[in-house]
Amino acid sequence: MIQLQALSKKFNKKVIFEDVTLVFEPNKSYALVGQSGSGKSTLLNAIGRLEKPTSGAITLDNRNIWDIKEKTFFKRYLGYVFQNYALLDHQTVLDNLKIVNRDRAQIKAVLEQVGLDQSYLKAKIFELSGGQAQRVTIARMALKEKKVILADEPTGALDDKTGSEIIDILLGMVSANTYVIIATHDPKVYSRVDEVIDITQL
């Protein structure tokens, strides 16, 4: 499980969140909700070791995440879906996916899982729609079989239909060995997860 123990984050004198204690279990999906500026993205980044908390601890399977080697944590454990995709725009879909897994059969299988056929392999990222690029991001993460899947406003730049399909894919990744945590303010997203956590109430 993932445990947040008395977690606090401050920027200068501004308190982003304070004394947060939470438990996340595998085989469940979670949404961190709250209005813009409430700190949900900062909390998500702390769980993903992208921002260090001011105080408190985060453990993954009883191990402090900051005690795990940085390369090991990001390579083996963390999968992150950003609103801006975090892909190499001028490289092809295949090039982006081969960075993490060079097995063509696995690449094709994962692309199908996210709703893209083989014709997209030679397309460059900048040629894709927002929804298609987001699918490639998720495909790349699936190829690495990540344990902790974090998504920060993954539908923010997408139309309702595409956004719903992206959430379908993310929720389909929930398993006995996987954590799926989504930061969102969209009720169409958080109404579909197993547990909603309002960060303003912590």
Question: Model-predicted segments: where are they?
Answer:
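Conserved ABC ATPase "signature" region
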Residues: 104-120
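Conserved ABC ATPase signature
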Residues: 124-128, 132-134
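Helix-to-loop junction immediately C-terminal to a conserved catalytic motif
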Residues: 48
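Catalytic Walker B motif of ABC-type/P-loop ATPase nucleotide-binding domains
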Residues: 149-152
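Conserved ABC transporter NBD signature motif
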Residues: 56-66
